[in-house]
C-alpha cells in the first residue's frame, strides 16, 4: 500500500531516475515515434493502490530513462534520439557534390614532391585571376596523357581498351555494370593493373 504522503506512487527508481508512468499503449507509431492513445484528459487507473496517471494527447513524453523524446517526430527511438531519414550512409572517399576539396589540397602527411616537377594547386581562371584546382584536375595532370587543359572526354575507338587493357567479358557488359567509385576509376587508369 502506498504511504500517506505519496499519493501518486513512487516517481523515481532506487537510483533516482524517473519512472516511466503507465497510461499509454507503448506501440510504435507511423514513423517510429511512440504515439499516445486515448481521449484527452482521460484518467487511467489499475486499482486502488496503483499509480494513477493523467494522459494528455500530444504531450511531450519521456523514454524509460527519463530522456524527453519528441512525440510524432520521424525516427525517434526508445532513448528519444531523433534519427535522420533519407540518408544512405557514408562512403569511403571522394568529395560530396557541392563540397570543396580544401581539406585535401594541403596534402596532409603523405609524400610531398619537391622541385619543379610537381603540379601547381591553382591555375588561370581565364579572367586575369587565379582559381584553385580541384582534385580531379590534379589527378588528370598526373595520369599519362593528362594535363590537356580541356575537360572534354575523347571517345576510345572500339576494340581498344586504352592503356593496354582489354575490354570485354561479363563484368563490363551494360546489364551487369556496377557503379564504380572515383578511386576504382583512378586505379583502372594507372599503369600496373588492377590492384
Swiss-Prot record:
Extent of Polar residues compositional bias: 50-64
Top-level taxonomic group: Eukaryota
One annotated Gene Ontology cellular component of this protein: nucleus
Region listing for Disordered, in residue ranges: 1-195
Expression sites (tissue/organ): Expressed in roots and leaves.
Description of post-translational modifications: Phosphorylated in vitro by CK2.
Any one Gene Ontology BP term: cellular response to water deprivation
Keywords associated with the record: Cytoplasm, Nucleus, Phosphoprotein, Stress response
Compositionally biased spans, kind Low complexity: 37-48, 65-88
InterPro entries noted in UniProt: Dehydrin, Dehydrin_CS
Compositionally biased tracts (Basic and acidic residues): 136-153, 173-195
Protein name: Dehydrin DHN1
Amino acid at each position: 500500500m502506498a504511504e500517506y504522503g505519496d499519493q501518486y506512487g513512487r516517481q523515481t527508481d532506487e537510483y533516482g531516475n524517473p519512472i516511466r508512468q503507465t497510461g499509454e499503449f507503448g506501440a510504435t507509431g507511423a514513423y517510429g515515434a511512440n504515439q499516445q492513445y486515448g481521449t484527452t484528459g482521460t484518467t487511467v487507473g489499475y486499482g486502488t493502490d496503483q499509480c494513477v496517471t493523467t494522459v494528455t494527447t500530444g504531450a511531450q513524453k519521456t523514454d524509460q530513462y527519463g530522456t524527453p523524446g519528441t512525440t510524432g517526430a520521424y525516427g525517434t527511438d526508445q532513448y528519444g534520439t531523433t534519427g535522420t531519414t533519407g540518408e544512405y550512409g557514408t562512403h569511403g572517399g571522394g568529395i560530396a557534390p557541392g563540397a570543396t576539396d580544401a581539406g585535401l589540397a594541403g596534402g596532409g602527411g603523405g609524400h610531398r614532391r619537391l622541385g619543379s616537377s610537381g603540379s601547381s594547386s591553382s591555375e588561370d581562371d581565364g579572367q586575369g585571376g587565379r582559381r584553385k584546382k580541384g582534385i580531379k584536375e590534379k589527378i588528370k595532370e598526373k595520369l599519362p596523357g593528362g594535363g590537356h587543359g580541356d575537360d572534354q572526354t575523347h571517345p576510345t575507338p572500339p576494340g581498344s581498351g586504352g592503356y593496354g587493357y582489354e575490354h570485354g567479358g561479363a563484368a563490363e557488359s551494360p546489364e551487369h555494370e556496377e557503379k564504380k567509385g572515383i578511386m576504382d576509376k583512378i586505379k583502372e587508369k594507372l599503369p600496373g593493373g588492377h590492384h
